[in-house]
Amino acid sequence: MAARIAGVNIPVQKHARIALQAIYGIGNSRALEICKEAKIDPATKVKDLSEAELDALRTEVGKFSVEGDLRRERSMDIKRKMDLGTYEGIRHRRGLPLRGQRTRSNARTRKGKRKPIRS
């Protein structure tokens, strides 16, 4: 029995709180909030939930922007900033850190592999 919520197969062997976190956009606090609203014990394993309880979880998860919709929203926000030419948009375009971190000696992950200086 595979439990599908928001188009994602959630792991049935795990507790409801942990299993919900397999959905993009749901972290620990939101998973606890969803369990509370659906009146489900977060420590209950997904395989032990009834179909009615799974439907309650689906309803609660449906109230949030998750998975594809959330990914699309985030990419559109970044694209909008780039089109407007904001500081953040420029940093995104150049592939540099956005939030004031130093780049002279760090930021290797964001900048990528070192490029040799051509003379």
UniProtKB/Swiss-Prot annotation:
UniProt KW keywords? Ribonucleoprotein, Ribosomal protein, RNA-binding, rRNA-binding, tRNA-binding
Q: Does the keyword Ribosomal protein apply?
A: yes
What name is this protein filed under? Answer: Small ribosomal subunit protein uS13
SUPFAM superfamilies for the chain = S13-like H2TH domain
Indicate the quaternary assembly. Answer: Part of the 30S ribosomal subunit. Forms a loose heterodimer with protein S19. Forms two bridges to the 50S subunit in the 70S ribosome.
Q: Which family does it belong to?
A: Belongs to the universal ribosomal protein uS13 family.
Which HAMAP family did the record assign?
Ribosomal_uS13
A Pfam family that the UniProt record links to this protein: Ribosomal_S13
Q: Where is this region: Disordered?
A: 90-119
What is the scientific name of the source organism?
Coxiella burnetii (strain Dugway 5J108-111)
GO CC annotations, alphabetized: cytosol; small ribosomal subunit
Q: Does the keyword Electron transport apply?
A: no
Which terms does the UniProt entry file under GO BP? translation
- Compositionally biased intervals (Basic residues): 91-119
**Its biological purpose:** Located at the top of the head of the 30S subunit, it contacts several helices of the 16S rRNA. In the 70S ribosome it contacts the 23S rRNA (bridge B1a) and protein L5 of the 50S subunit (bridge B1b), connecting the 2 subunits; these bridges are implicated in subunit movement. Contacts the tRNAs in the A and P-sites.
Listed GO molecular functions?
Answer: rRNA binding; structural constituent of ribosome; tRNA binding
What the entry lists under NCBIfam families is as follows: uS13_bact
Q: What InterPro entries does the record point to?
A: Rbsml_uS13_C, Ribosomal_uS13, Ribosomal_uS13-like_H2TH, Ribosomal_uS13_bac-type, Ribosomal_uS13_CS
Gene3D superfamilies for the chain: 1.10.8.50, 30s ribosomal protein s13, domain 2
Superkingdom is Bacteria
